[in-house]
């Protein structure tokens, strides 16, 4: 039996006023759970361009200033994902549901009060990363 292919995706931590943006998923995979904006690459796309595109497509938010955060290698029994994660602190626009077939809503959560039902593919790295962040943002 052949192993399934390794999937590579990008995710964006969108941070404002010590809050992080999560989308409530709908559909087959992860229905009812909360996740970061993100997705898969299009052919020929750079890491940064994929992250910017996914952020814009899913939320309507535009950011030209993403910071690389980390890469997570996440092999599981039936799937193997590599997550390439970015941070957006500088952005324009307000989060809106631009893909109603994928998301029910976008909501800001306090960094120390994350939702209980985080998407399984993100559970391993979201809380750990956010605990390490320190913000001084008094704009």
Regions found by a protein language model. Give the residues of each.
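Residues that flank catalytic or metal-binding motifs in active/ligand-binding sites
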Residues: 8-10, 82-84, 102
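Conserved N-terminal beta-strand and adjoining loop/helix that marks the start
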Residues: 1-20, 37, 71, 87
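Active-site-adjacent beta-strand/loop module that shapes the phosphate/pyrophosphate-binding cleft
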Residues: 72-95, 107, 122, 128-133
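Short, charged/polar surface micro-motifs in flexible loops or helix N-caps
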Residues: 15-20, 29, 42-43, 88-94
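Beta-strand scaffold of nucleotide-dependent catalytic cores
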Residues: 22-24
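Nudix hydrolase/Nudix homology domain
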Residues: 29, 33, 100-139
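The catalytic Nudix box helix
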Residues: 36-68, 86
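Residue-level preference for beta-strand/loop junctions
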Residues: 4-6, 64, 80-82
């Amino acid at each position: 039996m052949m192993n399934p292919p390794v999937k590579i995706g990008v995710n964006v931590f969108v941070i404002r006023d010590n809050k992080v943006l999560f989308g409530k998923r709908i559909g087959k995979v992860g229905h009812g759970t909360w996740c970061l904006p993100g997705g898969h690459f299009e052919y020929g796309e750079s890491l940064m361009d994929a992250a910017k595109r996914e952020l814009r497509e899913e939320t309507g938010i535009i950011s030209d200033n993403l910071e690389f955060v980390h890469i997570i290698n996440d092999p599981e029994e039936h799937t193997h994902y590599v997550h390439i994660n970015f941070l957006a602190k500088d952005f324009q626009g307000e989060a809106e549901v631009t893909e109603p077939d994928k998301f029910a809503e976008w909501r800001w959560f306090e960094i120390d009060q994350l939702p209980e039902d985080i998407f399984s593919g993100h559970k391993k790295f979201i809380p750990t990363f956010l605990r390490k962040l320190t913000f001084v943002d008094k704009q």
